């Protein structure tokens, strides 16, 4: 994948994340600045999602640790867990919120 394709795929994934948060009605503030999306929770904890251009990966950092995702067959798959990005992100958001979020 070239650089343009990578950015289009990441932008699309970040939009999916925003839509999932909005649809869930979750009390999560999010902001995207440059290559970084920050999710902030009531207790001040954060999840950071950023694109790593040289590696063509998306990285996620949370209080559980760091995760690297590669695009495989149209999905962003974690090299550590094998989970898809949105699946793992939802689990991490539940942990940060200290309660289950009603994901749609």
UniProtKB/Swiss-Prot annotation:
Pfam families assigned: Frataxin_Cyay
Name of the protein: Iron-sulfur cluster assembly protein CyaY
Gene3D superfamilies: Frataxin/CyaY
Record carries keyword Iron: yes
Gene Ontology CC annotations of this record: cytosol
Keywords for this protein: Iron, Metal-binding
Species of origin: Vibrio cholerae serotype O1 (strain ATCC 39315 / El Tor Inaba N16961)
Stated role: Involved in iron-sulfur (Fe-S) cluster assembly. May act as a regulator of Fe-S biogenesis.
SMART domains, per database record: Frataxin_Cyay (SM01219)
Family of this protein: Belongs to the frataxin family.
GO terms, biological process: iron-sulfur cluster assembly
CDD domains: Frataxin (cd00503)
High-level lineage: Bacteria, Pseudomonadati, Pseudomonadota, Gammaproteobacteria, Vibrionales
A Gene Ontology molecular function term of the record: ferrous iron binding
């Amino acid at each position: 994948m070239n650089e343009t394709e990578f950015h289009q795929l990441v932008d699309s994934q970040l939009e999916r994340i925003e839509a999932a948060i909005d649809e869930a009605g979750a009390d999560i503030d999010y902001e995207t600045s440059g290559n970084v999306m920050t999710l902030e929770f009531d207790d001040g904890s954060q999840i950071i999602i950023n694109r790593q251009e040289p590696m063509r990966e998306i990285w996620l950092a949370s209080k559980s640790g760091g995760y690297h995702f590669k695009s495989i067959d149209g999905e962003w798959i974690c090299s550590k867990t094998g989970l898809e990005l949105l699946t793992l992100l939802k689990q991490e958001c539940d942990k940060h919120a200290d309660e289950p979020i009603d994901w749609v």
